[in-house]
Curated annotation (Swiss-Prot):
This is Probable protein kinase UbiB. CDD domains: UbiB (cd13972). Pfam families: ABC1 (PF03109). Pathway: Cofactor biosynthesis; ubiquinone biosynthesis [regulation]. GO terms for molecular function: ATP binding; protein kinase activity. One of its GO terms (cellular component) is plasma membrane. The active site is at D291. Is probably a protein kinase regulator of UbiI activity which is involved in aerobic coenzyme Q (ubiquinone) biosynthesis. Keywords: ATP-binding, Cell inner membrane, Cell membrane, Kinase, Membrane, Nucleotide-binding, Transferase, Transmembrane, Transmembrane helix, Ubiquinone biosynthesis.
Amino acid sequence: MIFKNTRRSYQIIATFLRYGIDEIIPDIPFTYSARLTRKAFFWLQNEHKDQPFGVRLRLALQELGPVWIKLGQMLATRRDLFEPALADQLALLQDSVAPFDGKLARKIIEQALGNTLETWFDDFDEQALASASIAQVHTATFNKNQPLAGQNVVLKVIRPDIEHIIKADIALMYQLAKLIPYLSDDAKRLRATEVVREYEKTLLDELDLTREMANAIRLRNNFENSEMLYVPAMYPDFCHKNVIVMERIYGIPVSDIATLTENGTNMKLLAERGVQVFFTQVFRDSFFHADMHAGNIFVNPNHPEDPQYIGIDCGIVGTLNQNDKRYLAESFVAFFNRDYRRVALMHIESGWTPADTDVDAFEEAFRTVCEPIFAKPLAEISFGQVLLNLFNVARQFNMEVQPQLVLLQKTLLYIEGLGRQVYPALDLWQTAKPFLQKWLDQQVGFKAILRDLKQQAPQFREHFAQFPEAVFNALQQQKHINYRLAELNKTLQSQADNKTYNVKMIIMGSIILSLLWQFNSLPLWLSLPILTMLCLALCRRK
């Protein structure tokens, strides 16, 4: 194991050096050891000096394999952290790798299901239909012994040993992430350790296909009988951590504009429905498919005049709470109304930026960054870019990273890109505005109060039944507390009295000692009254 990790570490270092990635190491005292180590690998020189840094980084990640490719893809969506040219290069990374042996896939599936494939399926194709870094898919058909006999299905299987590879590479990423903040002030903004932690969670979640199954079932239920989106059925009886079985779909890739056009698809309606599907997930369901790139989205070839999307691969999803949704809706509406003070206050009220933030400076920062956007026609404004600008400004005012909103912003950029690819004249604002306005209207006013009361009525009934007992218990507790407080006051008063008495006795004792010391020298008429008074004082105390 140690040998494998050492060899992998050398492979990663050598790859970065051959592509000149080490040029980002600044000449400062802290990096002396890193620069010295670089000289130790003197035979590994930059072989691609004619290429810009972004291209070299993309090629290096591509060579390092699936785990690093997916990291680059994730970083490509963080345009709040990278220059546009670098983000554009990372976006070109393709998560496609050669499939592993179909016979091995068969063996893994049979081990998971507990019997031979022929027990349930006919026509299992050992040639993978598609292959990616985490898993690959094969086709089959339910045999005559199954209730869904003849149904075409897809079997998705996790790559063997991929978990070990991921964990080993992630461990190395953490080591690199610890060094990055010391490179420059800009590098500190990257928060590299947080990025790696977020990436690790995403990858490990994708390794558990039961999560994907649960996500797909939930999304399918949310859009049951919908004319906008169809999600393939899952077959839970055949689903395990490393294998899932789902309905096979037949659709046109959303990026295949030529075929969509040839099929007579209503492109304007298709583009608008893409935006509607996204905002429905966000504001109605608080649960959204967060990996809606072109490879996971298809279009139903039937009834092209009334187009319907087909969504697959629900391994990555996002969830939002009421605070998140209010932030999104009010920020977008305030932005389009050019109410930058409201935008600033939204960030502070949400608790994502410090309460002592200078609101005037915050407002002016938003105005400076956002106002130039309105040089474009309203229809051409990108919601994803608006969110990106808001995040960029907020980070300057110490906004805490909100992973769910970063995921949403990435998904929104995907949706916008696909929508404008399908129909370049898509007016995002007019398409999204009804969803935003409807949701905001539902959050205020008498109807909102009635809705909240209705939702909480079962809790009220449950708590009301327990109300008499709760009151009695509270009174008993209060009675006990009052008794304990009274006892405590007596104890404290007694301690205070004792303390006062002790002080007095110390003083009296001192006087007695001094008198006894000089008793023989005192006249009789003075000695007797003093002794009498001291005796009376002692008797009174007793």
